[in-house]
From Swiss-Prot:
Catalytic activity: a 9-cis-epoxycarotenoid + O2 = a 12'-apo-carotenal + 2-cis,4-trans-xanthoxin; 9-cis-violaxanthin + O2 = (3S,5R,6S)-5,6-epoxy-3-hydroxy-5,6-dihydro-12'-apo-beta-caroten-12'-al + 2-cis,4-trans-xanthoxin; 9'-cis-neoxanthin + O2 = (3S,5R,6R)-3,5-dihydroxy-6,7-didehydro-5,6-dihydro-12'-apo-beta-caroten-12'-al + 2-cis,4-trans-xanthoxin
Cofactor(s) this protein cannot do without: Fe(2+)
Protein name: 9-cis-epoxycarotenoid dioxygenase NCED3, chloroplastic
Presequence extent in this chain: 1-38
Gene Ontology CC, one term: chloroplast stroma
InterPro entries for the chain: Carotenoid_Oase
The organism of origin for this protein: Oryza sativa subsp. japonica
Residue ranges, annotated region (Disordered): 1-26
Subcellular location: Plastid, Chloroplast
Amino acid sequence: MATITTPGYAHIQRQHGRCSTTAGRRGASNSVRFSARAVSSVPHAAAASSAPAFLPVPFVPGADAPSPSGKSAIGVPKAPRKGEEGKRLNFFQRAAAMALDAFEEGFVANVLERPHGLPSTADPAVQIAGNFAPVGETPPARALPVSGRIPPFINGVYARNGANPHFDPVAGHHLFDGDGMVHAVRIRNGAAESYACRFTETARLRQERAMGRPMFPKAIGELHGHSGIARLALFYARAACGLLDPSHGTGVANAGLIYFNGRLLAMSEDDLPYQVRVTADGDLETVGRYDFDGQLGCAMIAHPKLDPATGELHALSYDVIKKPYLKYFYFAPDGTKSADVEIPLDQPTMIHDFAITENYVVVPDHQVVFKLQEMLRGGSPVVLDKEKTSRFGVLPKHAADASEMVWVDVPDCFCFHLWNAWEEADTDEVVVIGSCMTPADSIFNESDDRLESVLTEIRLNTRTGESTRRAILPPSSQVNLEVGMVNRNLLGRKTRYAYLAVAEPWPKVSGFAKVDLATGELTKFEYGEGRFGGEPCFVPMDAAAATPRGEDDGYILSFVHDERAGTSELLVVNAADMRLEATVQLPSRVPYGFHGTFITGDELTTQA
């Protein structure tokens, strides 16, 4: 095993104007103003980890408005202009609003929250400090300066999702709680034509913007202990009085991005996806909440898997309130949905990601579970169940029901993300590649232990029911590897390489690594002192080909921010030799975010 570190690059210092949030809220003594101070190393998710949301609000598909295309099931309720909210409320609603606001400020904030302080996992001063802080929207900026040479084959849009709170928090806030914002760079003919960033216009954001303040509960930052119960009660009361409308969803769409069936979908697992369209001038516009033309009536997790061979999109949906706690389904290339397969679980479980092989889906059932009753005891509803044995379920992709699932125990294993999986017929094994995280619940709850994310090979023997597990990197080379991908043209098939963020110093990302999954050879690309980024996005040389010319024949795209200079860039790195090819100077600050994707030029022309 060898560890190879490639040099970073000579940074071109060029000052750009920073975006800053202009959204305010009515004064509250515990509101937090965003700053650009350096974030401390605390046990929340890595900058690029995606956001699991588990708002315990009954999911209501709702009767969404027609889309601009005329098809049903796409739409966001039109929000009134700011200042019109009070005009459309009747006397009872105005009185209820005043009473509930007084209850929130007088009891929830002053009695339940402020005297007790906040854990670091819910403290806005920690969670959204420095370059984790939000920015305002940026309309398309054109003709971006480029140092080096962008390979001419890269033709399309690199888009990355992230959490970007529109309003200052009024109480607890976790990095995962922010409103979704997509950042996009259009590349064509060796030039960086444009950059833009826009909020995904969720029903939640539109309503809060109309009211001029945050009103929906934040799933991780607020919903813990007695104050969390009180904030849930406030939410239900406001909805009952017609002050809020949860029927069009409560999600933030801040985690994943995928292009499927002519649509770029922004996702968080607490809601339906939202369709975002890339315009001809490189701008981003929200088409609306997308239910696959009336076929999808439940939330969908933020990491669906697109099979490169069949064109099918495979997905999961979990529920924290009622059974079935987990469902599996898939979509044909034309968007036709399969029947749901209800997967029996004894308790609601955090399932943020899963994997596919050529013939199977691989579903983790780990020890991080939801116990809403813990809020009654003053705790977090997300807990580590030490009595539970972690396991993986292997289910045929086109199974009629869960009776075809084979469960294999993998004790003391929690993989927040799974990078790939494949079948090895000679041994009746399914090989799963993921990052095993300890302490398993440290993203959500404070811990004195150092967080570790170990790249791991897990072998599931579906015949014997036994499993084995090995760390791919030796102890001498161990480094936290989180968020990344394999060559998407080989997803579900055996791969040699994975491209993963080096999540150190946690929770920042100081570079990315190319890992040989067979030998453990690690090649790092380091961003340099005071420079941090996020998820590496691998773009195959022929992004539309079913079979690449070489597995590592392509380029890595990643946003990077220089904390000393206050500037942000897009890097283009050769994945074969891990050398920098080009740097694109961006016109405004790009906060550390979550997951991204590359949309080819051909795909852009097929947008619905």
